[in-house]
């Protein structure tokens, strides 16, 4: 390609401050260095993690200017030295948590947080040299990276350990959803909780991740799936995802866990906290059966808080854990999951509520912020 080895100037949506509208502007994108890949992003969507970072909810994670975004799909523009599994023109998914294949975590079954390329909201530069690949076009000042990916840009540079090559016949606009939210939810149901047939499930928060948990639970043969959300507009999509019972905490005269106990006659086997709320996490824990209950935390929490659980409560037979990317190893396990989805295991169309051009990204952010969107797919 003519651009190979050269700096590319392209459009990016840059965050300049907490809660400020993203600025669509020209940025410079350096060529990929050793073991890096430069990607032309074709589709990206907005996740609540992007929204949290944009709002600057956790002060320790604030870094500006910054290019957010991590759920996307695109085509390789060029590769750096040492990259052998990909080449220009390949279709790829950026993955916010990588897999080097060599560390003790990557070599261990059941673990997916690579020691070198695991997701780190504090990290704002490339792993290889501690520098950025983005610069302002006017004064050449550095622009920081986000979650290993920074997909709110027409071009981005990513470590090859965080890039998954996919079949060019796969529809990129659909499988882009599998680079974060859908995989996170379904994987939590399968890989982390390991939902068993005929079991009961409660899901707190019915955004994209929560609905993906429901899809995963239904695929595993759960007998009853309960959805909890303060926005009743989400209940219809919940039904389509397999949820049979709904609780709106604002309309209940009892605590949510008390209602769940009544519905299930003793609590669910599995609960999932997908709301990023410490109160929801507490209710999710108390909603599980005393003896076999498992709670999986998936929501992004705004600031560090202690778990709302007394240590002695864990002696009641309940357990609690958390999950990143649904426990999937992104490069070795995700390809089979993508194939399963495209063969009809999940309805990926369910998750795309809006489609907008890239320059309308601030409108997309507001739709998600107001609870009016599930996934807004941006076309670059």
Swiss-Prot record:
It holds the Pfam family ADH_zinc_N. Binds 2 Zn(2+) ions per subunit. Belongs to the zinc-containing alcohol dehydrogenase family. Class-III subfamily. Keywords: Cytoplasm, Metal-binding, NAD, Oxidoreductase, Zinc. This is Alcohol dehydrogenase-like 4. NAD(+) binds at residues 49, 205-210, 229, 234, 298-300, 325, 375. An alcohol binds at residues 49, 70. Its EC number is 1.1.1.1. GO terms for molecular function: alcohol dehydrogenase (NAD+) activity; zinc ion binding. It is found in: Cytoplasm. Zn(2+) 1 binds at residues 47, 49, 70, 180. Homodimer.
